[in-house]
């Protein structure tokens, strides 16, 4: 008998994945957690029934949410990641030699624990001496730190439940204060196909706070519609105008210097959401 995972992506649409093996399922303090091995996409982290990352395509998301801001900032030394307990963003951040410290603030310690156990390709840098794993509320952490981080990456789940407070103007104001005087913030901001109102509102909220606000897209097969948005807010540096003439000094599978520029070219219906 075949076993399938059905992910309800929106009210009227779903994706299904054929499961080879269920590695772990548990109810944590905050959510239902599962890691399964699938035939099509390899091992997969699922939270509250929603696919968060897979071994097959995780590099797209983690490279784009990391390298766009870190190559935009001329000297990123201290980085904060809110969420991202799987460790993929930490892995990509630590490819940058300028980074002296990265703080991962994850509310659910079980995500970190199980990903270290079952997703070593993604979580491989969580024990790096440059990485501090802080288990706690990202909103409170940001509020308690001022003028400290060069880059803040909000690597959150969808804007529901525990992650709902990570979307919106009040949190972005706290992020602004947590950043250094030339700091950069980035967040994953859902799909413009299914959730255009979320994309539009997040961009509007960020633009009211940051002098430079940009939206860019990436193709991520696992995520609803496969067409995903990221919003970046910067105090000083424009990611569209950054000088990338020097040789790329890190190994990537998706991000390139050319793509850094190209990803900001938006389809008209997405561009309209930024107006």
Swiss-Prot record:
One of its GO terms (cellular component) is cytosol. Transmembrane segments: none annotated. Its EC number is 2.5.1.16. This is Polyamine aminopropyltransferase. Spermidine binds at residues 62, 86, 155-158. Pfam families: Spermine_synt_N (PF17284), Spermine_synth (PF01564). It comes from Clostridium kluyveri (strain ATCC 8527 / DSM 555 / NBRC 12016 / NCIMB 10680 / K1). One of its GO terms (biological process) is spermidine biosynthetic process. GO terms for molecular function: spermidine synthase activity. Pathway: Amine and polyamine biosynthesis; spermidine biosynthesis; spermidine from putrescine: step 1/1.
């Amino acid at each position: 008998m075949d076993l399938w995972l059905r992910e309800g992506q929106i009210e009227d649409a779903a994706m299904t994945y054929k499961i080879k093996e269920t590695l772990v399922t548990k109810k944590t303090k905050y959510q239902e957690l599962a890691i399964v091995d699938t035939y099509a996409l390899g091992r997969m982290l699922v939270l509250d029934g929603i696919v968060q990352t897979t071994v097959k395509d995780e590099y797209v998301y983690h490279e784009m949410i990391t390298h766009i801001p870190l190559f935009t900032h001329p000297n990123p030394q201290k980085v904060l990641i809110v969420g991202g307990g799987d460790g993929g963003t930490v892995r990509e951040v630590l490819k940058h030699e300028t980074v002296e410290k990265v703080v991962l603030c994850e509310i659910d310690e079980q995500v970190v624990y199980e990903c270290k156990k079952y997703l070593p390709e993604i979580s491989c840098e969580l024990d790096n001496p440059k990485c501090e794993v802080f288990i706690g509320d990202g909103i409170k952490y940001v509020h308690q730190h001022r003028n400290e981080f060069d880059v803040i990456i909000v690597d959150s789940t969808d804007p529901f439940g525990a992650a709902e407070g990570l979307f919106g103007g009040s949190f972005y104001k706290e992020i602004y204060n947590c950043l250094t005087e030339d700091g950069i913030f980035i967040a994953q901001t859902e799909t413009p196909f299914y959730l255009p109102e979320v994309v539009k509102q997040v961009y509007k909220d960020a633009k009211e706070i940051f002098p430079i606000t940009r939206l860019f897209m990436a193709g991520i097969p696992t995520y609803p519609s496969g067409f995903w948005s990221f919003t970046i807010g910067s105090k000083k540096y424009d990611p569209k105008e950054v000088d990338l003439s020097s040789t790329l000094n890190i190994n990537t599978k998706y991000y390139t210097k050319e793509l850094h520029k190209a990803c900001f070219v938006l389809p008209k219906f997405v561009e309209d959401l930024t107006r």
